[in-house]
């Protein structure tokens, strides 16, 4: 297995060099899971960066549910020059939940590669309740109002020009955070895999978020394995409703049983093309929009 993985990294599977055009050239995957992690992962960050670079990708955003990844992004960039790698912080219980201090320290990390703030994922109240778990959770709102600490985190996101990523809230909580972000001057916002549980945004809610300046994320992980809830047809319909100019395609790969990230992206692109999404729209959603979200264009 290790020998095969090394070969894939070294050759980029050999497929892109055979293609007249490489559909991964210039792609930025904003939703990447990899080792080191407390959850088993298919590949580590350095090997993934090498693989993505050899496949022609422009960049990666490293996501860890429990550890900030800005420091990891700095190290990966030194080890694998030629690919833009970013990190962030996911406001789960391991970093104190909705903790402004965690955001401040992430933003100040050497290199300035910490860009994303996920507003709690696996420990969010919505996720814990949806999963019917009896354990502590991170709350972003109460009685229909964002908590003061949530507003404080959003203020820091605006101050440091970071990306507000909604994480795993309810759909209405995601909209509340997007409204607050817009009010406080946040320039970069994305609704994390908006269609997937526990968010389950409707088409109308996705369009509302988009009209407030947020990108809507669609991930390959929502189409396969244990997380499969939707079909390519469902995704294509939603993309047409919202408009490709407001959408981002990402892999959300890294699970041991799933494909490697570049292959997940290719499968996502191919499936959407079969449903009538054009190559120009895919390029917009996988290359241009992620770059704008990260402030690269």
Please report, for each region that a protein language model flagged, where it lies by residue:
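Short acidic/histidine-rich active-site segments
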Residues: 244-261
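Structural preference for beta-strand elements that scaffold enzyme active sites
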Residues: 27-29, 59, 84-86, 114-118, ...
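Divalent metal-binding pocket/active-site signature
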Residues: 34-43, 116-201
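A metal-dependent hydrolase metal-coordination microenvironment
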Residues: 42-136
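Distinct, well-ordered alpha-helical segments
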Residues: 72-76, 171-185, 201-210, 231-239
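Bacterial N-terminal signal peptides
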Residues: 4-14
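Mid-to-C-terminal alpha-helical segments outside catalytic/metal-binding sites
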Residues: 264-297
């Amino acid at each position: 297995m290790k020998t095969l993985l090394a070969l894939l990294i070294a050759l980029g599977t050999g497929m892109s060099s055979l293609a007249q055009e490489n559909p991964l050239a210039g792609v930025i995957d904003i939703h990447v899971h990899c080792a080191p992690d407390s959850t088993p992962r298919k590949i580590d960050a350095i090997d993934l960066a090498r693989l993505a670079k050899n496949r022609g990708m422009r960049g990666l955003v490293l996501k860890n549910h429990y550890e900030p990844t800005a420091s990891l992004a700095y190290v990966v960039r030194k080890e694998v020059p030629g690919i833009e790698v970013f990190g962030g912080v996911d406001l789960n219980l391991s970093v104190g939940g909705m903790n402004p201090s965690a955001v401040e320290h992430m933003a100040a990390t050497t290199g300035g590669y910490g860009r994303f703030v996920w507003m709690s994922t696996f420990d969010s109240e919505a996720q814990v309740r949806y999963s019917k778990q009896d354990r502590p959770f991170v709350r972003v709102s109460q009685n229909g109002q964002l908590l003061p600490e949530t507003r404080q985190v959003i203020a820091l996101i605006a101050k440091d020009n970071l990306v507000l990523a909604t994480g795993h809230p309810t759909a209405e909580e995601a909209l509340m955070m997007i409204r607050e972000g817009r009010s406080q001057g946040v320039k970069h916002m994305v609704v994390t895999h908006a269609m997937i549980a526990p968010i389950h945004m409707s088409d109308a809610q996705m369009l509302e978020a988009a009209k407030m300046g947020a990108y809507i994320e669609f991930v390959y992980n929502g189409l396969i394995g244990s997380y499969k809830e939707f079909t390519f047809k469902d995704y294509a319909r939603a993309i047409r409703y919202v408009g490709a100019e407001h959408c981002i395609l990402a892999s959300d790969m890294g699970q041991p049983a799933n494909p490697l990230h570049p292959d997940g992206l290719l499968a996502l692109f191919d499936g959407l093309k079969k449903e009538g999404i054009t190559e120009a729209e895919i390029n917009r959603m996988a290359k241009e929009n992620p770059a704008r979200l990260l402030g690269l264009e």
